[in-house]
From Swiss-Prot:
One of its GO terms (cellular component) is cytoplasm. Belongs to the XseA family. The gene is xseA. It is found in: Cytoplasm. It comes from the Bacteria. It comes from Carboxydothermus hydrogenoformans (strain ATCC BAA-161 / DSM 6008 / Z-2901). Bidirectionally degrades single-stranded DNA into large acid-insoluble oligonucleotides, which are then degraded further into small acid-soluble oligonucleotides. It holds the Pfam family tRNA_anti_2. This is Exodeoxyribonuclease 7 large subunit.
Amino acid sequence: MALFIVTVSELTDYIAEKFEKDDWLNQVAVEGELSNCKFSQGHLYFTLKDERAELKGVMYKGRASALPFIPQDGQKVIVFGQVAVYKKRGIYQIYAEMIEPLGIGALYLKFEQTKEKLRDKGYFAEERKKKLPRYPEKIGIVTSKNGAAIRDILTTIKKRWPKATLYLVPVAVQGDEAPGQIVKALNLLNRYKLCEVIILARGGGSFEELAAFNEETVADAIYASNIPVVTGIGHETDTSIADMVADRRAPTPTGAAVEATPNLVEIWNNLREQRQKMVKALANYFQREQKNLEFQERRILRAYEKLITDKSREVTEGLERLLRSFKTTFQQEKNRLSLLKEKLILLSPYLRHKQQKEKLEELKERLFLRCAELLKRNQAVLIQQSLRLRTSVKNLVLQKNLVLSSYEERLKLLNPLKILNRGYAVVFDFEGRVVTSVNNLPERFKIKFSDGEALAKALGKNIIEGDKNDDL
């Protein structure tokens, strides 16, 4: 057999043509373990191997960017594609069109990789999550317009918080279009600030059916939302990436509605309890103020009595001093008169006697005039002190009366029964509880007026319709 001499290129072209004409090699699925994985200019280069052989492989940028997971060394995969010759190096390799992981599956692998990526970015951090509004008036709902989820949410909100205005943005909750619709719905509610809290929910399903809520784009939209997001996705055992990013996570759609709303019945009960506490506190305050007023009254009376006692003592002491002064002066003049009398007796002559007698009469008259003048002056001082005492006592009594009047006015203002003087009345049941609604009116009841109570019997009820939420 004659041998033909060919060039390397000719031989390589010949072999490449054989590969191209082999239908099986043009569409092959190869199972193996990835190694030497690397990206270069967007292209993925890898080696696929098993226990006995290795196969070079490449996936071009357009297909590599669409992979639902990141290929890594050691992963067991199935590579779908075409086996052909790489003429420049004279080797054959597989040109991959699709790569699927074995074992945990592509969706779960993508889930784990996305979760790790978002955790590193801080999407799950508790400190960045927003607080839910306590009494939301507007609630956005992002879910399917059909199915049990929306029915459960509407039923729960109607029961717990019927005053809220609801904005439903219907979306697909599974399938290829679901992530995009969910993102648009969240962005719409944020752009126009339509609500104060958003419920993102769907009913239970398989891991594949919940895949839309594991998409990174949905997580980005939740993270970027300025409005708090509450999720209720699947059943209690299901946890999606959307749940991890959300500001509050509930196990079911019903649970999400509970998390997003307060309980109106509980609020009414709390208000009723607070009102009872306020009435009790007001009664206690009134009682304390009344005791304080009585104490102030006793204190003022004691101060008034003490002032009277002190002033009386001062007057008595002044009178005693005046009397002692008068007695001293009178005694001094009396002693002087006695001395003169003794001198007169000693002189004895008639003329001297007459002169001394006249002088004695003059001195006697001067003595009485001086005593009268002294008595009059001291009497004026006594009257002046008495007037000052009376004025001081009068001013003190007036001042204390003003204080008492001020406390009396404050007590009147604090008296909860004062309103009854203007024609109002309070209805009690026979247990002493205030009846605040016609719906709670018993058949027999008591009516309290400003001057007494009356027993009454209900002959009928007339309910006046109005805004039930006015008290909120």
